[in-house]
A protein has these predicted regions:
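Hydrophobic transmembrane alpha-helices
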Residues: 50-57, 98, 132-136, 158-169, ...
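Residue-level signal for transmembrane alpha-helical positions in Major Facilitator Superfamily
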Residues: 59, 103, 107, 137, ...
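Transmembrane helix-boundary elements of multi-pass transport/secretion proteins
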Residues: 3-77, 86-106, 112-131, 153-157, ...
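Hydrophobic alpha-helical transmembrane segments of integral membrane proteins
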Residues: 14-16, 44-45, 79, 161-162, ...
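Extended hydrophobic-aromatic, low-complexity segments
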Residues: 122-123, 138-139, 154-158, 170, ...
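Short hydrophobic, aromatic-rich alpha-helical segments embedded in or entering the lipid bilayer
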Residues: 175-216
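Transmembrane-helix boundary motif in ABC transporter permease subunits
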Residues: 138-151, 233
Length: 241
């Protein structure tokens, strides 16, 4: 899996170049004018949410489409004929996609901090840990979603269905506390809600892993990754049953 993706230039471009280009545009728009009272730009405040969103979006799309190729090409069927258990198979795919997911997360974080020169507080190690847990969940979700698509076009059609509600309800555009009660309750089902909240707590408030709220959000992200990985394994069982 790693060798196959490494040889795909379009995949590398999607993972590395695309986030950098989009972040550059965002930085050009919101990274110049600072508040004279605080010295912070709009980008400084948006950075935690943007880091979470771009890390989640690109790797979710990649894993859904790539795993669908494994299904349609017969590769998955051949692997299922081996003594590997389905849980072990999903774990192998998670490791394969996870390597690229972590690379992308590192690129996004490094570019945001070093190239866009945002102001931040807290530990970058903690920021990367939150990113890492989030992208593992994104990979697991992509693997699970691929079971419901018959071709790449259908897989791509799941992207707005899954991501658009999170764009509006996770705190990316509007703080979750300002949402109506029903929408605020709905936001609790989205992983980006917890990732954005945890990243803001670290990068804006300067909190660390000793804070119980950050630990709770991390725990929820871990649980999300486990649930979606289990769903991905279950989808394979249904497929071959």
């Amino acid at each position: 899996m790693i060798l196959q993706l490494r040889g795909d230039r379009r995949t590398i471009a999607l993972l590395v170049v695309a986030p950098v280009v989009v972040l550059s545009l965002v930085g050009a728009i919101w990274g110049r004018q600072a508040d004279p009272r605080t010295g912070r730009t709009i980008l400084d405040d948006l950075a935690p949410a943007l880091i979470a969103f771009f890390a989640f979006f690109f790797i979710f799309l990649l894993s859904a489409v790539a795993f669908l190729r494994e299904r349609t090409s017969g590769t998955l069927e051949r692997l299922l004929a081996t003594p590997l258990r389905r849980g072990e198979l999903i774990a192998g795919y998670l490791v394969g996609f996870g390597v690229f997911a972590l690379l992308q997360a590192l690129v996004i974080l490094a570019f945001t901090v070093l190239a866009l020169k945002i102001q931040y507080r807290g530990s970058l190690g903690t920021v990367f840990l939150i990113e890492a847990v989030l992208v593992v969940g994104a990979v697991s979700l992509g693997l699970a979603v691929s079971a419901f698509a018959r071709n790449e076009l259908q897989a791509v059609q799941f992207v707005p269905l899954i991501l658009l509600p999170q764009v509006f309800l996770s705190g990316l555009l509007v703080p979750v506390d300002e949402l109506p009660d029903g929408l605020r309750q709905a936001s609790a089902f989205f992983p980006l809600t917890y990732a954005i909240r945890a990243l803001r707590a670290v990068m804006v408030a300067g909190l660390g892993l000793d804070d119980p709220l950050i630990l709770r959000d991390l725990g929820i992200l871990v649980a999300f990754a486990l649930v979606t990985a289990t769903a991905a394994a279950a989808s394979i069982r249904r497929e071959v049953a």
